From Swiss-Prot:
Keywords carried by this UniProt record: ATP synthesis, Hydrogen ion transport, Ion transport, Transport
Example GO BP: proton motive force-driven plasma membrane ATP synthesis
Family annotation (Gene3D superfamilies): ATP synthase (C/AC39) subunit, domain 3, V-type ATP synthase subunit C domain
Function summary: Produces ATP from ADP in the presence of a proton gradient across the membrane.
Parts forming coiled coils: none
Gene, per the UniProt record: atpC
Protein family membership: Belongs to the V-ATPase V0D/AC39 subunit family.
Entries under HAMAP family matching the protein: ATP_synth_C_arch
A GO term for molecular function: ATP binding
The protein's name in its UniProt record: V-type ATP synthase subunit C
Transmembrane segments: none
A GO cellular-component term linked to this record: proton-transporting V-type ATPase, V0 domain
Transport recorded as keyword: yes
Length: 352
């Protein structure tokens, strides 16, 4: 995979204004053109169907590791083959690869483009904050919480690690406040709401509201705003699906999408307003099926954005989703091979 000629490609040059972090509206397309050229090269190094099939066809866990060591994951795989190594070493290797990838993409950008890419990466921060809150409330312990965190966000790993060792949400909020991350105050306010109602849903929706409020303020790229609007609609549909059978609480509405508060209220009665993606979520037979429908809709939206917005953030958005999916699939395959599960069973999990 990739160029083996050893020659250094000639990249499009960024304008002087963009290089000086003075990225204005006029030079944004040139800046994304540069970043997208780099990301297109990175996209060619994602594992294709044949590589994933080879990993699935591995006869053992050790053979699976050998297959991965012949890909661009090789630099991260050294610990996995050490004596006594197991799934924790594989998890660290895959996590480090995802983190390295996101940091490389971020390193291509500056100015407004960098802030918009950071906004995309902050979606993983949002997920991690929810994982952190659930873990602390349920008493899962720092190690378990850390195993379920997604690397690649914008919160420093050391800050997340410290927060995961907290025994209560207030202490976690204090730990997250170090460094002044945009979502730290959002988390603190969400914890206050949880302490009042005792409902994790209130905390999680306040995190959603805070993230999307920040993201829509930062976003200047048209395709990014369009994608965020779609993501907000999907989020509201999932909230409505989780509340099926009861009256929707308007305090749980996440603004910023195509739905207004009244449209959100109608979701409780199954009225999706003709939106096929929302319909699929509302009519899903289970919460798990609804989440699959949501991921499918967002994957489709990201692919569409990459095709329609070749001079904006669409290609980056699509690449980051593909990379996350790649790592998630390899994690599933690795666990299946480690526990010697039947290949067909692993394949079903990967395809789901």
């Amino acid at each position: 995979m990739g160029d083996s000629s050893g020659s250094r490609p000639t990249w499009p040059r960024r304008s002087a204004a963009c290089s000086r972090n003075k990225v204005g509206k006029d030079c944004m397309p040139d800046d994304y053109s540069y970043i997208n050229t780099r990301v297109r090269v990175m996209r060619t190094k994602l594992l294709d169907g044949r590589a994933l099939d080879a990993a699935l066809a591995s006869g053992s866990y050790q053979e699976f590791l050998r297959v991965l060591s012949e890909t661009d994951f090789a630099p991260n795989m050294r610990e996995t083959t050490a004596e006594g190594a197991g799934l924790p070493e594989l998890d660290r290797a895959l996590s480090q690869n995802l983190f390295d990838t996101t940091q490389r993409v971020l390193g291509f950008a500056d100015g407004d483009a960098k802030r918009e890419i950071e906004t995309l990466l902050m979606k993983w921060d949002l997920t991690n904050l929810k994982t952190l809150a659930r873990g602390i409330v349920s008493g899962r312990g720092a190690e378990t919480i850390q195993q379920n965190l997604i690397p690649g966000g914008t919160i420093k790993p050391s800050v997340l690690q410290t927060a995961s060792q907290s025994t209560d949400l207030a202490s976690a909020a204090t730990a997250l406040g170090v460094g002044g991350h945009p979502l730290a105050k959002v988390f603190r306010n969400a914890v206050t709401a949880y302490n009042t109602t005792g409902r994790l849903l209130d905390l999680e929706v306040l995190l959603d509201q805070g993230y999307y409020r920040y993201a829509t303020q930062v976003s200047r790229d048209t395709s990014l705003r369009r994608y965020l609007s779609r993501e907000i609609d999907i989020t509201n549909a999932l909230i409505a699906r989780n509340s099926r059978g009861g009256t929707l609480d308007t305090n749980l509405f996440v603004p910023g999408g195509s739905l207004d508060a009244a449209g959100y209220g109608r979701l409780g009665a199954g009225d999706a307003g003709g939106n096929a993606d929302i319909t699929a979520i509302l009519e899903a037979p289970s919460i798990e099926d609804a989440e699959v429908a949501a991921r499918t809709a967002l994957d489709r939206a990201a692919r569409s954005s990459a095709v329609s917005d070749v001079e904006g953030v669409g290609i980056i958005l699509d690449f980051l989703r593909r990379k996350e999916i790649e790592v998630a699939k390899l994690r599933l395959i690795g666990r299946g091979k480690y526990y010697d599960l039947p290949t067909d069973e692993i394949r079903r999990e990967v395809q789901a």
